């Protein structure tokens, strides 16, 4: 694969959100592992759902101060399930400059390598920022299609792009664009378009509508809350929210709007991060052990990268605003997809465990780096620390009602994450669809004396 660009994270680009000293030996091992993944592995581990998380896992652990051995361990955790890169279609590659051909090829997973090579060549010609401007932010039919797909698959391509921009890696950015182009379509772009059309007729108050208020409105709306059905399984977004409730969902979501200035963008980005964290910890079920929702976890893990994105001054303000508005609107849709669980702040504020009560952030970073995991837990704890940092200035005073996460709730939720994922097999670390009763029947979530079984759901 001569066209593949080497992955080379430089010492000056080790992430704007790193919370630990990163050694040169760890950085060298990170580059070796990421380059091997780039050259050897498909972005998708199977034909439906299933994403390659190696980049996410390795870079999250690196940013938290991981050793070379910990980086190798996280690579090995994911390597066994990967598929080889599909072949590059040389004939198609030469035709992708035609927007009609490009659009007609979208969603073809077998063409991931073709898309990857296409974007690498484009970046070699004129740089990754220029390529992102054309293929995400140009407001053309092709760019709008790609931007919508960036949010598909529980935010995975978005997370990948976030890592690429944070660590200034053209190869990882090309992977993200290739993933977005070849990903299946659940109709999220339709939801975005409808919400943006509705937003034109909204008249936001000077302070805007709190996102957490809109979360509660989702649960109170019978048409939205009942649209996803358990029998939809992994298609609750496509068949449930987009299929059965697109109009009421987009109308409600359109109420989240950001005024076109840097101050409001910064505040509402922090607000979005806090609401994602709050949903993750507060969506519990009385009488069952605590467990964090798989999809709320992804909402928070992707939210971290909007701290990165809103600082990219080479992206026009209106495009940065659009990206954050879409993220918050999609978070509302995913809350509905997950079953609109009742949210209880005391699940976070009252959290206590003898295993973790004494752990601070540094101890949690060190502990999660040692866990056999595909990177989800390390990303989650890192995202919580970032959320604590960017939200602190807004948690009290005039914006307090917009920020449900306050003070030590961030650290308590990080401890909850560590306690409920450590030593667990991957399929038991999280719980999907917390608003439905079925997943809570898992035997490992039963209190003493109870025995239940739950249907397994294939996750992303």
Curated annotation (Swiss-Prot):
Known EC number(s)? 1.-.-.-
Q: GO molecular-function annotation terms?
A: oxidoreductase activity
What is the enzyme's class at the highest EC level? oxidoreductase
Q: In which pathway does it act?
A: Secondary metabolite biosynthesis
The UniProt keyword set, sorted, is: Oxidoreductase
Q: Which Pfam families match?
A: Questin_oxidase
In the UniProt record, does the keyword Magnesium occur? no
As cofactor, the record names: NADPH
- Superkingdom, natural source: Eukaryota
Family annotation (InterPro entries): Questin_oxidase-like
Q: What happens when the gene is disrupted?
A: Leads to total loss of monodictyphenone and agnestin biosynthesis and accumulates emodin and chrysophanol.
- The reply to whether Oxidoreductase figures as a keyword in the UniProt entry is yes
Homology family = Belongs to the questin oxidase family.
Protein role: Baeyer-Villiger oxidase; part of the gene cluster that mediates the biosynthesis of agnestins, dihydroxy-xanthone metabolites. The pathway begins with the assembly and cyclization of atrochrysone thioester by the non-reducing polyketide synthase Agnpks1. The atrochrysone carboxyl ACP thioesterase AgnL7 then breaks the thioester bond and releases the atrochrysone carboxylic acid as the first enzyme-free intermediate.
Record's protein name: Baeyer-Villiger oxidase AgnL3
Q: Name its species.
A: Paecilomyces divaricatus (Penicillium divaricatum)
- Give the organism's phylogenetic lineage: Eukaryota, Fungi, Dikarya, Ascomycota, Pezizomycotina
Q: Which gene encodes it?
A: AgnL3
